[in-house]
């Protein structure tokens, strides 16, 4: 009987790019499903404040900003700490949970809040899982 060992394949240099684009694609996919399902993705940030429609551009920009910020923080931590991945994962998870305050604090329907929370969680999950796989300490 022969024994085979699975070798861990190193992450590609493209892994962070794939993570950022994947997080963005996940948010856009949820936005598309919500829109096709007839969800009215509009929010207001307080009484008397204007109602804002959540567009695909809003979704793309928010996902890119969040995931690129995560990538930047991970790169900085790798430069200055020896346990960057662990520290970054904790910080990223805290920021992901705090980001839920945005959609949950808006004046919008429960359905809109649910769709927005789903987008936030999708971006956070893909970003955290994807960037943890990148090379580095």
PLM segments and residue spans:
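N-terminal signal-anchor transmembrane alpha helix
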Residues: 10-35
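Membrane-water interface at transmembrane helix exits
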Residues: 30-38, 74, 78, 131-135
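Internal alpha-helical transmembrane segments of multi-pass membrane proteins
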Residues: 16, 75-96
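Short, Lys/Arg-rich, polar N-terminal cytosolic tail immediately upstream
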Residues: 1-13
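Perimembrane loop-to-helix junctions flanking transmembrane segments
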Residues: 42-55
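Lipid-exposed faces of alpha-helical membrane segments in multi-pass integral membrane proteins
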Residues: 22-30, 61, 65, 69, ...
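Membrane-water interface at the C-terminal end of transmembrane alpha helices
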Residues: 15-19, 122-137
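Membrane-helix boundary connector in multi-pass membrane proteins
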Residues: 101-115
């Amino acid at each position: 009987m022969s024994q085979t060992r699975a070798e861990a394949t190193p992450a590609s240099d493209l892994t962070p790019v794939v993570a950022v684009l994947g997080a963005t694609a996940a948010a856009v996919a949820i936005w598309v499903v919500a829109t096709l399902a007839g969800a009215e993705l509009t929010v207001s940030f307080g009484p008397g404040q204007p109602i804002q429609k959540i567009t695909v551009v809003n979704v793309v920009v928010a996902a890119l900003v969040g995931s690129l910020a995560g990538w930047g923080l991970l790169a900085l931590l790798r430069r200055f700490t020896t346990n960057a991945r662990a520290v970054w994962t904790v910080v990223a998870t805290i920021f992901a949970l705090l980001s839920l305050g945005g959609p949950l604090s808006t004046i919008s329907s429960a359905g809109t809040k649910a769709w927005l929370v789903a987008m936030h969680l999708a971006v956070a999950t893909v970003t955290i899982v994807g960037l943890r796989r990148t090379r580095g300490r």
